[in-house]
Amino acid sequence: MGEYGVYTTDEFDKDFKKLDRSIQQQIKKEIDQLELNPYVGKPLGYPFFREKKVQGYRFYYLIYDEYVVVFVIALSDKKSQQKIINSIRHLIPFYKEEIRKKLDLP
C-alpha cells in the first residue's frame, strides 16, 4: 500500500477553522497519519467509512482504494455524531462524485 492522498470538504474546512489552535494541530496530526494507513479509524457500517476521535471531537472520512485517496468529510462533537453519520451515509454516492471531480476524472 502506497501513500494515500488526503482531501477535505469545504464543510470540514469551515468547521475546522472554528476550533482552538491546539485541537486543530492534534486533528491535523491524525489526518496526516491517514496518508500511510487510512484504516486506523473506527469503521461506521462500511469498511471504507470511518471516524477518528480527537479529544471531544470526531472527524469522519471515506477511503477510496481505487483512487488511493482519503476524503475527510465532516467534523462533529459527540452530541451531533449520529446526525452527521446518517447524513454522510445518505450522501456516499455524492462524495464519490466530488472526489472524482477533485481528481479530474471523467
Model-inferred region functions:
Residues 1-25, 101-106:
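Arg/Lys-rich, positively charged N-terminal/basic patches that mediate binding to nucleic acids
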Residues 1-5, 62-106:
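Enriched for short, Lys/Arg-rich terminal
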Residues 12, 60-61:
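GIY-YIG nuclease signature motif recognition
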Residues 29-53, 99-106:
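A short, surface-exposed loop/turn module that caps and links secondary-structure elements
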Residues 54-58:
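Short, surface-exposed coil-to-beta transition loops
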